């Protein structure tokens, strides 16, 4: 967890340190978790055995089975939102349809099952509508204050463009 006291501003050195720590977490924690989900285990990267020895590398993808089964129970029936005010109910229905929230919620749930966390981001799109999407902890992280309440202070998203230029938005 990345923490910054309330009396400190986020400067470039601190942000660089957080990004470096985040990259460490991605390589050593998040990538192995996704590899387990995708059945990419280290045994498959070992050199082949001599031709006269059997080389049976079998993997049971129990991680994927557990994640998919539990998410089917958890979010298999889409979330239903009811409201007494018809105007609010109509807007919430529009938001759900516009952003395909059933799929977003299923993906976010799966992400949380794989990594232990995931992020939902709200934004205003180019048409002026509220957009909702999910972000993986491999590409984003939250910076909290150092209080007992751990209030969010900053959210960082790390992404690449088509030219492989890395950007960080805070």
Feature names for model-found ranges:
Residues 119-170:
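Extended, regular secondary-structure scaffolds
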């Amino acid at each position: 967890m990345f923490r910054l006291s309330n009396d400190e501003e986020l400067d470039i050195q601190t942000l660089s340190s957080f990004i470096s720590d985040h990259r460490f977490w991605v390589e050593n924690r998040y990538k192995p978790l996704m590899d387990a989900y995708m059945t990419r285990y280290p045994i498959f990267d070992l050199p082949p055995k001599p031709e006269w020895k059997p080389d049976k590398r079998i993997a049971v993808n129990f991680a994927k089975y557990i994640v998919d089964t539990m998410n089917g129970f958890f979010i298999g029936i889409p979330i239903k939102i009811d409201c007494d005010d018809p105007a609010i109910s109509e807007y919430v229905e529009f938001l759900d349809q516009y952003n395909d929230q059933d799929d977003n919620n299923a993906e976010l749930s799966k992400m949380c099952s794989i990594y232990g966390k995931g992020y939902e981001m709200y934004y205003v799109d180019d048409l002026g509508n509220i957009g909702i999407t999910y972000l993986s902890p491999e590409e984003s992280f939250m910076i909290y204050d150092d209080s007992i309440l751990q209030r969010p202070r900053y959210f960082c998203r790390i992404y690449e463009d088509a030219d492989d230029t890395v950007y960080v938005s805070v």
